[in-house]
UniProtKB/Swiss-Prot annotation:
This is Regulatory protein E2. The keyword Disulfide bond does not apply. GO terms for cellular component: host cell nucleus. Its main location: host cell. Phosphorylated. Transmembrane segments: none annotated. Keywords: Activator, DNA replication, DNA-binding, Early protein, Host nucleus, Phosphoprotein, Repressor, Transcription, Transcription regulation. InterPro entries: E2/EBNA1_C_sf, Nucleotide-bd_a/b_plait_sf, Papillomavirus_E2_C, PPV_E2_N, Reg_prot_E2, Regulatory_protein_E2_N, Regulatory_protein_E2_N_1, Regulatory_protein_E2_N_2.
Length: 396
């Protein structure tokens, strides 16, 4: 085998570039052609990497990038090759695919390592101000792999929290969240989402509880069409109820009578996806809670009273109780897909001793704030038969 020279490397290097140009000019819609293109990209960068290792800085008239750049591009091409080869074995191989839809820019954009088609822009107005806005990209069609590397096709969706898709298990997989940028670039912690002639905004209303004379602020979502007049724009409150307060109250009382009492108290919290939630205190902190918080709040987005109450609390957490195998699989899924929605996860554990609850498995999840905890509970699918207990700890 003859050693490679600069001339032989230049010839092979130019041949791979010629293959790429031919495939680009072909404007094919066949995945096999796109696979050949990325094979040529991989070989081009492998040759460039080898030349750089041999202290060759040019092949022909073209200067070569650094070793780190050629290594990265070669690995990137290998990854895309593997993804296309896998997609070729799926039912979506016969669909119309452009070279741009298999490009590195598309595959590396969120959601990463997924194929996407038909992008659309989602404009987010921080502080509900058009002058303080940022465009995000979502997709009409998203192709993703499950745990068995099988491809599935779904639609890209948008809500007030961010851009997401719903996977085969019914879980909401968020690949873009607006809240971190709202805290970073906004002052009020509020934002408006506009896309496809639709508008989703947070409207602040006030309500009071019979057991507490002080009013509390609640944020609800409203959606509308951007083509309507702002003054006459009808708002549709999320989870709204068109029944009268009297009928809602009577139904709540009936539900309270049907549910069992535990330790002299009644759990009136609505059930979500077959789970029972035991609520901790979400009102003002007690004197013993003051000064024990170990995390720092965002600079904006709280009223003066709300900031004082939140800073006085400990970091919030949720205790999940259920079957051991279900909790283990669920924990692995959460740490993979929803790492941005919590602070830390515990391992699966059990209480011991004669007073334990029959060996039920438990998982603790800690959060940076009450808002993050609420987003987690609203987003993540909880395993069936799992109970939820909200609480706080002095330290983690």
């Amino acid at each position: 085998m003859q050693p490679e020279t600069q001339e032989s490397l230049s010839t092979r290097f130019a041949a791979q570039q010629e293959i790429q140009l031919t495939l680009i000019e072909k404007e094919s819609y066949d995945l096999k052609d796109h696979l050949a293109y990325w094979k040529a990209v991989r070989l081009e960068n492998v040759i460039a990497y080898y030349a750089r290792k041999e202290h060759i800085t040019k092949l022909g008239l073209q200067p070569l990038p650094t070793l780190a750049v050629t290594e990265y591009k070669a690995k990137e091409a290998i990854n895309i090759q593997l993804l296309i080869q896998s997609l070729l074995k799926s039912e979506f191989a016969l669909e119309r695919w452009t070279l741009a839809e298999t490009s590195a820019e598309t595959i590396n954009s969120s959601p990463r390592n997924c194929f996407k088609k038909v992008p659309f822009i989602v404009n987010v107005w921080f502080d509900n101000d058009e002058r303080n806005s940022f465009p995000y990209t979502c997709w009409d069609f998203i192709y993703y792999q499950d745990d068995q590397n099988k491809w599935h096709k779904t639609e890209g969706l948008v809500d007030h929290n961010g851009c997401y898709y719903v996977d085969l298990n019914g879980d909401f997989v968020y690949f873009t969240l607006f809240q971190p940028d709202a805290v970073k670039y906004g002052k009020t912690g509020l934002w408006t989402v506009r896309f496809k002639n639709k508008t989703i905004s947070a409207s602040v209303t006030s309500s009071s509880r019979n057991t507490n004379p002080s009013s509390e602020s609640r944020v609800g979502l409203s959606t509308s069409s951007s083509s309507e007049s702002p003054r006459r724009r009808p708002s549709i409150s999320e989870n709204s109820n068109t029944e009268s307060p009297t009928s809602s109250t009577s139904r709540l009382r009936e539900r309270r009578r049907r549910e069992p009492r535990e330790s002299g108290t009644t759990d009136t919290t609505p059930r979500r996806r077959g789970t029972k939630r035991k609520l901790g205190s979400d009102s003002a902190p007690t004197p013993s809670e003051v000064g024990s918080r170990s995390t720092t709040l965002a600079r904006h987005g709280y009223s003066r009273l709300g900031r004082l109450q939140e800073e006085a609390r400990d970091p919030p957490l949720v205790l999940f109780t259920g079957q051991q195998n279900n909790l283990k699989c669920w924990r692995n899924r959460c740490t993979t897909k929803y790492a941005s929605l919590f602070l830390c996860f515990s391992s699966v554990w059990k209480w011991l001793g004669p007073n334990s609850d029959g060996g039920a498995a438990k998982v603790l999840v800690a959060f940076k704030s009450d808002a993050q905890r609420q987003v987690f509970l609203n987003t993540v699918h909880i395993p069936k038969g799992t109970t939820i207990t909200l609480g706080r700890l002095d330290s983690l």
